[in-house]
Amino acid sequence: MVKIVFWDNCLNERGTTTTLFNYAYYNKTILGNESIIMYNTSRTDNINEVIDLFKKEFKVIGVNNFKLVDTILHKLKCDIFYITKAGENEGQISKVCKTVVHCVFHCNQPHGNVYAGISQFIKGDKKRVPIVPYMINLPEYNKNMREELNIPEDAVVYGRYGGYDAFDINYVHKIVYDVAKQNPKIYFIFMNTQQFCGSLPNIIHIEKTIDVNRKVEFINTCDAMLHARHIGESFGLAIAEFSTKNKPIITTPNFKLNPKVDIAHIHFLKEKGIWYNESNLYNILTTFITEENKEEISKKDWNAFKDYTPEKVINQFKKVFID
């Protein structure tokens, strides 16, 4: 049995924490190894409910200074220290055990014993680094929020969740407001999303959740996901979660706004993506899904992430980080 300490700078609702939980959980349940969680207690963006969720499954250790990490790793007789990073070598590695670095945004500064990326589409010299992708494992759950939110069953609903400030393309904000104002039977629901326009009854904001059933309930409420992140995605966990629940993803390649955009969402979705720009978004939101074609749209295959199951990904995790 291998003992792995998983480090996260903070434990919150973001995708990096979600994926760290998944790696640690399936390292324990599928691979039969020991998973221990360590995090920085001084971060103000830690969320107590998330920390409690980790404590139900793992031993959790908080430290207020990274310099304390090696002393704890030595005492624990740890075999591997796993850490997620943007990609920079900022000095956060262990000197007492094998350090495996998992890069989220780029892979330009190799360091540690293993240096890997989250997708083959992140920036940097990807030919030199192995890839361990995110895994998608939302539960089967059939409820939705339409009754709770007073949304008619025949209404068209677009939604998104993700980083609070990551729905940030200005022209999308304006078009969403215009569509909602002129089409009262088209709804937009936003979870954990910064408010960006005036109030309308069919633009609904919902607080973040760490309950995966609640997350699926939110996805089930939507007919499609509307994605609008100006820097693109180096993987796109929220996109993947909507996609595995067979929801169309309405998004943009976005090269005009940002020539250095991350392009993972473009490569993953391919022909399954519904691609917008400023000139066609209004038309897409008002004609792509209608009351008349909703059922037909829902029967099509929109899942672009069939290969990212826990069983497949954790074996890649083992191959790259453990073996």
Model regions and ranges:
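Conserved catalytic-core segment of nucleotide-activated headgroup transferases in glycan assembly
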Residues: 134-199, 205, 212
